[in-house]
């Protein structure tokens, strides 16, 4: 019961924060696991405070971004509050019902943590605090490892996986963290939007001066008029793509920023329920790190 009361109190506090009370902070308690989420949310509130004073952003873009972030915070918080109330309902008798509520609360908390992570990444990229450290890595092996980490989620959604990766080493000078971030963001994006189509594909090709990574899904796709803006951090689809399927909308902007830092290119082509493919081309040998245009 103490944890339930704490959840409700903290959820209300975060709602005050996203309405503009940036002085709000959450206090730790004896629940160690829960404290990890509290720490992340406090960091998020501080980051929102910093976002409000970043001079390099236009006022319109800044307000739009903060509006999107506020909405993305409120959505899982509303669910958390609702299910916490349900846990307190004296008519909820069965252990199964309680476990289902706890599972949903956990999933919504994970959504919050993902949003927080994206905001931190974007802030670090804006401040040029992420250094690209080049080293010869086997891009194919790192891709295989990324795929393995997503197999449980693919199985959960009943998605078929098509993989085309060279058997031999595919060495390229890339930043390990940045490359893995690109892989994870694009695979996660394909699962999120492609699960209705039940298919996901991953392809890697070694060319003379570059490696070419393609990750595709057979989901509803992206309208042609929206593709030019799909990598903008403040952009939301007219068809509420991000709102319908979840996600902050920042993942693709972060992916493009890492691709740009590698001196690479990213593109997308989309045919609804056939193939929506994101293709990343990274140079095998990197020149000096590239500054990201803000």
Model regions: which residues?
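Short helix-loop "hinge" at the ATP-lid/N-box region of the Bergerat-fold HATPase_c
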Residues: 190-191
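Acidic ATP/Mg2+-coordinating residue in the GHKL
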Residues: 217
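Short conserved segment of the HATPase_c
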Residues: 222-234
């Amino acid at each position: 019961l103490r944890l339930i009361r704490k959840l409700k109190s903290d959820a209300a506090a975060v709602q005050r924060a996203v309405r503009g009370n940036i002085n709000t902070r959450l206090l730790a308690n004896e629940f160690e696991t829960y404290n990890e989420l509290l720490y992340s949310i406090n960091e998020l509130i501080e980051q929102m405070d910093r976002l409000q004073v970043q001079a390099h952003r236009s006022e319109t873009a800044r307000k739009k971004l903060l509006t999107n972030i506020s909405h993305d915070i409120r959505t899982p918080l509303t669910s958390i509050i609702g299910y916490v109330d349900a846990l307190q309902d004296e008519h909820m008798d069965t252990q199964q019902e309680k476990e289902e509520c706890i599972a949903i609360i956990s999933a919504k908390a994970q959504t919050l943590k993902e949003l927080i992570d994206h905001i931190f990444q974007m802030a670090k990229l804006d401040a040029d605090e992420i250094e690209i450290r080049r080293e010869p890595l086997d891009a194919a092996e790192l891709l295989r490892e990324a795929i393995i980490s997503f197999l449980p989620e693919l199985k959960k959604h009943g998605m078929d996986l098509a993989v085309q990766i060279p058997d031999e080493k595919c060495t390229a000078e890339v930043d390990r963290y940045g490359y893995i971030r690109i892989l994870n963001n694009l695979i996660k994006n394909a699962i999120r939007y492609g699960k209705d189509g039940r298919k996901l594909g991953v392809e890697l090709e070694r060319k003379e001066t570059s490696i070419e990574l393609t990750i595709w899904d057979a989901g509803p796709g992206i309208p042609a008029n929206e593709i030019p803006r799909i990598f903008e951090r403040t952009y939301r689809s007219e068809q509420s793509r991000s709102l319908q399927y979840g996600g902050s909308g920042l993942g693709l902007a972060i992916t493009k920023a890492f691709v740009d830092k590698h001196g690479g290119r990213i593109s997308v082509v989309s045919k609804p329920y056939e193939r929506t493919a994101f293709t990343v081309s990274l140079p095998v040998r990197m020149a000096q790190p590239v500054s990201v245009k803000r």
